[in-house]
């Protein structure tokens, strides 16, 4: 026999113990504020605490203290309340911070709840945006239709999103014709358009033909007096006139919207043909939003297109900021800055990273730094169990087993000692230097003697010439 309320009472008792500081053996410090909790509860709720507490399971008698600087105290308060009560206080201001902290603490349940909250808020915003791209308020006021005006107010008001058909809610896209009651109330145009021109614009603007609503389903109280009698006496004439008015009104409404909101119309989202799903209550709101906006991006998952303008221009915009990228993979990586997702865990220490290259650098610099590995078998070796081999200019390390298998007997072993430079003895060096200096002196003396001899010869010749002249 099972008691469904047993786990609820158990959580309540644990929460009361935490608030009264009873049996709390784990202290968490966030921004200088201390939070006390039970290590068993944290171990069962968070993957990060599970890894942290499993490493320090030997010190069971002393309380454990952990310090965090990656999130705020208010964010951790919300997460701690969720751990002990199962209730997560989310709002538009703290959903990103809570999701980032939950990703750091490896709490998948909290991440899933935050994803649903963000998706539902985006659905509401895009639904209001879709209502903005419906028929303008100017056209709705000129038609004078109370039924259409009620539908417009229902779509634009966020508090009455799920009205029933009894109150007359009606949602139409910008390419849908107004109800037939508004067309019958409006007086006929004095200058009707030519059928050829109407068919030409209709073929260009509306690829799919529009069929008027059946007149038999319209109550007589919604019609104006003369038009009701005309419908009863000559139904075929009214139907033909309504078709002509439908073409004219549709063309005018589409042209006016195209002129006024040409830029905004390209951003509109497609309407779902199942409009009656809005009348089924708030329970089907998420299903309806998924049907209307199938192009919505999913958080922490595959990112789909974000609008026709981005698909046409080849750029994708972040839904949280103004950052734009060219590839879906870049947008998915950028979203991790807002969501705090870390999908790449380290198998050695459990630390998680947002990018794969950061994980590789961490593993190489932290876990593989300073390790000597055999080049052949890739096993760790030491200076005792391995040797450094120098093959020409290449140097690598092999273990003794690989050396024996390879039969490397005639290989130069490099023990890490630099060979001394081979220089001649000091006596020989001095002799060479003295020899060079003596050679230079001898050459200089020979040159000096030759110069003196030349000068003496020249002087003697000059003296002989002077004597002959005298």
UniProtKB/Swiss-Prot annotation:
Subcellular localization, as worded in the UniProt entry: Nucleus
InterPro entries found in the cross-reference section: BTB/POZ_dom, SKP1/BTB/POZ_sf, Znf_C2H2_sf, Znf_C2H2_type, ZnFinger_BTB_dom_contain
CDD domains: BTB_POZ_ZBTB8A_BOZF1
Keyword Kinase on entry: no
Disulphide-bridged cysteine pairs: none
GO CC, one annotated term: nucleus
SUPFAM superfamilies the record matches: beta-beta-alpha zinc fingers, POZ domain
Pfam families in the record: BTB (PF00651), zf-C2H2 (PF00096)
The UniProt record lists the keyword Ribosomal protein: no
C2H2-type zinc finger locations on the chain: 316-338, 344-367
Disordered: annotated span: 260-280, 439-470
Protein name: Zinc finger and BTB domain-containing protein 8A.1-A
Species per Swiss-Prot/TrEMBL record: Xenopus laevis (African clawed frog)
Source organism phylogeny: Eukaryota, Metazoa, Chordata, Craniata, Vertebrata
């Amino acid at each position: 026999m099972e008691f469904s309320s047993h786990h609820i009472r158990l959580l309540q008792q644990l929460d009361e113990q935490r608030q009264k500081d009873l049996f709390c053996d784990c202290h968490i410090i966030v921004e200088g504020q201390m939070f006390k909790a039970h290590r068993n509860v944290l171990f069962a709720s968070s993957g990060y605490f599970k890894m942290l507490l499993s490493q320090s399971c030997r010190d069971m008698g002393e309380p454990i203290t952990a310090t965090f600087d990656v999130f705020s105290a208010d964010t951790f308060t919300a997460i701690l309340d969720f751990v002990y009560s199962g209730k997560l206080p989310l709002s538009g201001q703290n959903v990103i911070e809570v999701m980032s902290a939950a990703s750091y603490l490896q709490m998948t349940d909290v991440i899933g709840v935050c994803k649903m909250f963000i998706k539902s808020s985006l659905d509401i915003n895009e639904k209001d945006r879709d209502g903005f791209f419906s028929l303008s308020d100017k056209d709705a006021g000129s038609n004078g239709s109370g039924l259409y005006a009620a539908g417009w107010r229902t779509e634009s008001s966020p508090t009455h999103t799920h009205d029933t058909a009894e109150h007359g809610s009606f949602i139409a896209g910008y390419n849908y014709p107004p109800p037939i009651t508004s067309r019958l109330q409006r007086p006929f145009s004095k200058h009707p358009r030519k059928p050829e021109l109407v068919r030409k614009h209709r073929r260009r603007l509306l690829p799919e033909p529009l069929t008027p609503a059946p007149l038999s389903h319209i109550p007589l109280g919604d019609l104006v007096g003369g038009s009701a009698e005309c419908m009863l006496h000559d139904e075929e004439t009214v139907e033909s006139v309504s078709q002509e008015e439908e073409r004219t009104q549709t063309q005018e409404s589409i042209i006016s919207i195209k002129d006024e909101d040409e830029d905004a119309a390209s951003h509109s989202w497609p309407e779902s043909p199942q409009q009656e799903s809005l009348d089924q209550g708030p329970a089907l709101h998420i299903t309806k939003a998924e049907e209307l906006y199938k192009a919505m991006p999913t958080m922490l998952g595959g990112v789909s297109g974000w609008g026709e303008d981005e698909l046409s221009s080849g750029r994708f915009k972040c839904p949280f900021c103004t950052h734009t990228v060219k590839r879906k993979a870049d947008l998915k990586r950028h979203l991790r800055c807002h969501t705090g997702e870390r999908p790449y865990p380290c198998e050695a220490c459990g630390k998680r990273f947002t990018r794969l290259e950061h994980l590789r650098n961490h593993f190489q610099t932290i876990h593989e730094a300073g390790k000597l590995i055999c080049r052949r078998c890739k096993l760790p070796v030491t200076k005792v169990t391995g040797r450094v081999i120098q093959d020409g200019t290449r140097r690598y390390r092999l273990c003794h087993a690989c050396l024996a298998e390879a039969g490397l007997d005639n290989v130069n072993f490099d023990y890490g000692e630099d060979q001394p430079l081979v220089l001649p003895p000091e006596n020989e060096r001095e002799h060479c230097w003295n020899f060079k200096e003596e050679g230079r002196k001898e050459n200089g003396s020979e040159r000096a003697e030759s110069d003196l001899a030349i000068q003496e010869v020249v002087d003697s010749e000059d003296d002989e010439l002077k004597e002959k002249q005298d």
